[in-house]
Amino acid sequence: MKPTEEKIQGNASDLPVYLFKQGNNCEAYRYFGAHLETRAGEPGVVFRVWAPHAVAISVVGDFNSWKPGSHPMHKVDGDSVWELFIPGMKEFDVYKYCVTTRAGDLVYKADPYAFHAETRPSNGSKVYDISGFAWHDEAWQAAQKKADVINGPMNIYEMHVGSWKMKEGNKPYNYAELADQLIPYITEMGYTHVELLPVMEYPFDGSWGYQVTGYFAPTSRYGTPKDFMSFVDKLHAAGIGVIMDWVPAHFPKDEFGLYNFDGEPCYEDPNPKRGEHKEWGTMVFDFGRNEVQSFLISSALYWLEQYHIDGLRVDAVASMLYLDYNRKQGEWEPNKDGGKENLEAVAFLRKLNNTVLGRHPHKYMIAEESTAWPMVTKPASDGGLGFNFKWNMGWMNDMLSYMKTDPLFRAGNHNKVTFSFFYAFSENFVLPISHDEVVHGKGSLINKMPGEYEAKFANLRTFFGYMMAHPGKKLLFMGQEFGQFAEWNEAKQLDWMLLGYDKHTELKNYAKTLNAFYKDHPAFWQVDYSWEGFQWIVPDDSQQSVIAFLRKDTAGKQILVVCNFNPVLREGYTLGAPVAGTYKEVLNSDDAAFGGSGAVHNKPVRTHKKPMHGFEQSITITLPPMSTLYFEVPTKRTAKTAADKAKKPGKKTAAKKTTKAAPAEKAVKKPGRKPKAAPEAPTEKDAKKPGRKPKAEAEAPAEKPVKKPTRKAKAEPEPAAEEAPKKRGRKPKAAKE
């Protein structure tokens, strides 16, 4: 096989090359790489590559026994872009570029723009035609274009494609098999989106995909590019959005990859004090170079447009923004203004977001940015970076630290629960409980919780309830929804056998119920980024580790959220109520169905006329130990109707509390006793005596919880040291495939 002998008309003004060198070719993949083409009636493949320092380049592969120089490329522009048409080559043929460096060395490189690649440990590129896939997600795409990106529900299930579930022999599912397994689960659980750890081609399994060598190729570990298209298409058909991790911050030093592509720095910053992350062993892109900007922005748009991905979570943004990131004194140089900001990276991120969201305002651009860099989610025109979402790493760190604290000492750390509200509305935040928090000795989420076996589950249920109600979109890493005890290991599937144990199935049921509640109640997502959607009621009850607040939607509907972060039953807890009327408990983490003690309010709770917390009325409730409760706040019309009925003779009744196990049981009144007034708030002393009877308002005596006959409704014991989960007296069921 010989290359076509034709004179390639070199012209520096050729539009794709011109735009590429200007940093404005945002579809560079259409020109560079390997493309099936017919010339002079002969089908074949045209190859194009950018290599500004190369002396010579040839295409090598099985078709020429990998012989260097047998199929030499020619410069298109007389400068840095090389091209060759080879007749007879076809789809799936393997190839590389053999580059002769200025030092006289031969280096074999995979195609930076390849659409497909060999499966590791092999690393050659493959000719592949991405055109012709029949998409069926028109309805999804149309709905997304009309959706309110910022003020809509977003509840993300973060997952690693290869280790969510595996087949016999510890083999991962391919894209098609995974879709068949994943879609019913995500649909059942009620997540709105899945977020995939990087699926761009990468050589090292242990990098989880964060050391990318193929920025235009879905990893071949699980199938072909069109298999991945089908995976996305099927999720969209099921109403599930797809977000993927995208890694523009750095790339690995593998010899076949981008590193020293033509023997010298091309994609990486040539300055050694800017071009390498020594701690990670990776190279940093030269964000100020136009050709690199074209490469990266083309990659971002490629996934959004060619694979219909709904959004990108941009990895390691903080490492891009700061020249001194993970560098000691003397290992970095200040910018031209004497500062530590990477001005070129800042300009690149603004350009990236302007380009992507300018074309696709309904897509998500999510920054993993772990510092206090200002205005990450504000428009570039206003001095921001232009993302539309940012991970709230501060909230995550504070809350996990708080939840790991023994409840005996949480009173002194109460600020970790409330501090996030000093900045909660400064950015469009996502609350991330991600893969990074359940690896490297950090322990799984449930193993971060203090106490013995059952206490861990109660803590986690309380945390999940608080997280779902806190302003911001949601993200949870796979396995945490059912209480995976082991840390995540990319080489093993999740411990699905745990669903043979009651506590794990109950926790999964709780997560499912929370997800459904979130999706069905706009108060939890419609006004996430303004004080108009949130109001404190009890922010400062640190001694009892209790908080209470309101979430509101634009129609005026409100949800009252009360969290008890202490394993103490609190009877007669009184707090302010925004509207007079009856408050219906709509979710309780202590419900027996979720593995709790069953101390729930089956009947609505009436307000009484005692002003508290800035409101004209209040309610008195029972707080189960270690629990989160949601109450539906009456609308003013509902409250007025209830008040009118209450004025009628014989209609005034006191709210009573039962458990779901005994809905018909009535509270027995003791004759001759006059009810005492409710205290302003339970005291520390009261908290230590859960056996005391609650005092109640004359207008609405507090309900006394009725214990279920099969469970003891008692206060949690003091937390003990962590220990492995105990078997609950029966064999686990087999994991459902």
Predicted regions and their residues:
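Short, flexible loop/turn elements at secondary-structure junctions
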Residues: 51-53, 77, 88, 160-165, ...
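Intrinsically disordered, polybasic Lys/Arg-rich low-complexity tracts
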Residues: 636-737
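Carbohydrate-interacting/catalytic domains
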Residues: 1-153, 176-186, 454-457, 466-476, ...
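Conserved alpha/beta catalytic core and glycan-binding cleft of carbohydrate-active enzymes
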Residues: 308-310, 325-490, 498, 519-590, ...
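Substrate-binding/active-site clefts of carbohydrate-active enzymes
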Residues: 118, 138-153, 160-341, 605
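N-terminal cationic-hydrophobic initiation segments that often serve targeting/anchoring roles
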Residues: 186, 232, 304, 353-357, ...
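Short glycine-biased active-site loop of nucleotidyltransferases that positions the nucleotide triphosphate
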Residues: 74, 205-209, 253-260, 377-378, ...
